């Protein structure tokens, strides 16, 4: 279900955005050139049950090797710009200028976070999402090197588990996310999970923010669940 915002996009503020997330809806744009936004509340919502997160043996080896350096909130703007750029199999983007401004605003008040994956000093991939209560809403991810976005997701899940999160919302489910254990839940079930997650508070800083977390550390947290 979607409803287009017919008012000026500038009327949507970071505070309005957070209240929308608390109601189970999120904004999108038709394309990068479309200044309007529309609200989305899928009949079937994508989530990754944190206790059922799956990491393949091959990916675990990559994560453990620390071929990439993983940081948090080091370059949020570069991550959202990477997510907005064309990717293989995806020529267009729903991240328009207003979306970018809104999520940078959420980042500035500590409600939106990025995970960066670096290779030889260059940004190889990453993801960003919104934190509210014990829920994390994954917005988008990208990669410029093989497995970079997958490594970002592994490190994100480790951080969420360490911080006491109970809900990882992926909005939709793709074959890529299914490989990590993503499932679809009906809207009413999702609302129940969201309401429960909003009753408490989690910490995105439960793992260090000032130094990279190693792959071995991240996998140890995941395998304890």
Curated annotation (Swiss-Prot):
Q: What is its EC number?
A: 2.3.2.6
Q: Which Pfam families match?
A: Leu_Phe_trans (PF03588)
Q: Which reaction does it catalyse?
A: N-terminal L-lysyl-[protein] + L-leucyl-tRNA(Leu) = N-terminal L-leucyl-L-lysyl-[protein] + tRNA(Leu) + H(+); N-terminal L-arginyl-[protein] + L-leucyl-tRNA(Leu) = N-terminal L-leucyl-L-arginyl-[protein] + tRNA(Leu) + H(+); L-phenylalanyl-tRNA(Phe) + an N-terminal L-alpha-aminoacyl-[protein] = an N-terminal L-phenylalanyl-L-alpha-aminoacyl-[protein] + tRNA(Phe)
Q: An example of a Gene Ontology BP annotation on this entry?
A: protein catabolic process
Compartments it resides in:
Cytoplasm
Task: Please provide the record's keywords in A-Z order.
Answer: Acyltransferase, Cytoplasm, Transferase
Recorded GO molecular functions are: leucyl-tRNA--protein transferase activity
Q: Which domain of life is it from?
A: Bacteria
The EC class name is: transferase
Question: What does the entry list under GO cellular component?
Answer: cytoplasm
What does the function comment of this entry state?
Functions in the N-end rule pathway of protein degradation where it conjugates Leu, Phe and, less efficiently, Met from aminoacyl-tRNAs to the N-termini of proteins containing an N-terminal arginine or lysine.
Q: What family does the Swiss-Prot or TrEMBL record give for this protein? A: Belongs to the L/F-transferase family.
Specify the protein name.
Leucyl/phenylalanyl-tRNA--protein transferase
Q: Which organism is it from?
A: Rhodopseudomonas palustris (strain ATCC BAA-98 / CGA009)
- Gene expressing this chain: aat
């Amino acid at each position: 279900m979607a409803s287009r915002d017919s008012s000026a996009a500038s009327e949507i503020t970071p505070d309005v955005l957070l209240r929308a997330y608390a109601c189970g809806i999120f904004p999108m744009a038709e394309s990068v050139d479309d200044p309007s936004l529309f609200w989305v509340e899928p009949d079937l919502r994508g989530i990754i049950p944190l206790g059922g997160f799956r990491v393949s043996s091959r990916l675990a080896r990559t994560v453990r090797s620390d071929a990439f350096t993983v940081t948090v909130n080091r370059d949020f703007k570069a991550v959202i710009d990477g997510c907005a750029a064309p990717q293989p199999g995806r020529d267009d983007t729903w991240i328009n200028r207003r979306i970018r401004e809104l999520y940078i605003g959420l980042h500035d008040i500590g409600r939106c976070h990025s995970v960066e994956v670096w290779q030889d000093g260059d940004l190889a991939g990453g993801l960003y999402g919104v934190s509210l209560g014990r829920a994390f809403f994954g917005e988008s991810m990208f990669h410029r090197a093989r497995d970079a976005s997958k490594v970002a997701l592994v490190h994100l899940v480790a951080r969420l588990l360490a911080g006491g999160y109970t809900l990882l919302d992926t909005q939709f489910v793709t074959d890529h996310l299914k490989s990590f254990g993503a499932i679809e839940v009906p809207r009413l079930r999702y609302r129940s999970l969201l309401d429960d997650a909003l009753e408490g508070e989690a910490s995105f800083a439960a793992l260090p923010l000032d130094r990279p977390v190693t792959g071995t550390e991240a996998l140890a947290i995941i395998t304890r669940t």
